[in-house]
Amino acid sequence: MARIAGVNIPTNKRVLIALQYIHGIGPKIASEIIEKVKIAEDRRVNQLSDQEVLQIREIIDRDYVVEGDLRRETGINIKRLMDLGCYRGLRHRRGLPVRGQRTHTNARTRKGPAKAIAGKKK
């Protein structure tokens, strides 16, 4: 198992898919990394040489924000919105949908399980 950016990459999968196990790397960025290292998309992780794994690791460290740094940055951005007291920050603070979705019905994922209200049954 190769270890890149603190994540164990599965060895039996294609490089394009295996790189997506790293938080912050999706299909587009994974294909960009493969292109920079000049690896065929159908190669598997266990077929990579140590030099190629090292190149991938260097490119990710140099060019992309991934894993813990990305999670920290996202958390700081959300905290900043909450401290500002803007609409999006208030929605985060209250645990409601942030991007304009309806809340009269639905939004159960964001709001949590339904709470029983006394006297609601007929």
Swiss-Prot record:
Q: Please provide the record's keywords in A-Z order.
A: Ribonucleoprotein, Ribosomal protein, RNA-binding, rRNA-binding, tRNA-binding
Q: Which GO terms describe its molecular function?
A: rRNA binding; structural constituent of ribosome; tRNA binding
GO CC, sorted alphabetically, is: cytosol; small ribosomal subunit
Stretch list, region Disordered:
99-122
Alphabetized InterPro entries for the sequence: Rbsml_uS13_C, Ribosomal_uS13, Ribosomal_uS13-like_H2TH, Ribosomal_uS13_bac-type, Ribosomal_uS13_CS
Q: Which Pfam families match?
A: Ribosomal_S13
Which superkingdom heads the taxonomic lineage of this protein's source? Bacteria
Supply one GO BP term: translation
What quaternary structure, including any partners, is listed in this protein's UniProt entry? Part of the 30S ribosomal subunit. Forms a loose heterodimer with protein S19. Forms two bridges to the 50S subunit in the 70S ribosome.
Family under the similarity heading: Belongs to the universal ribosomal protein uS13 family.
Q: Explain the purpose of this protein.
A: Located at the top of the head of the 30S subunit, it contacts several helices of the 16S rRNA. In the 70S ribosome it contacts the 23S rRNA (bridge B1a) and protein L5 of the 50S subunit (bridge B1b), connecting the 2 subunits; these bridges are implicated in subunit movement. Contacts the tRNAs in the A and P-sites.
Question: What's the protein here called?
Answer: Small ribosomal subunit protein uS13
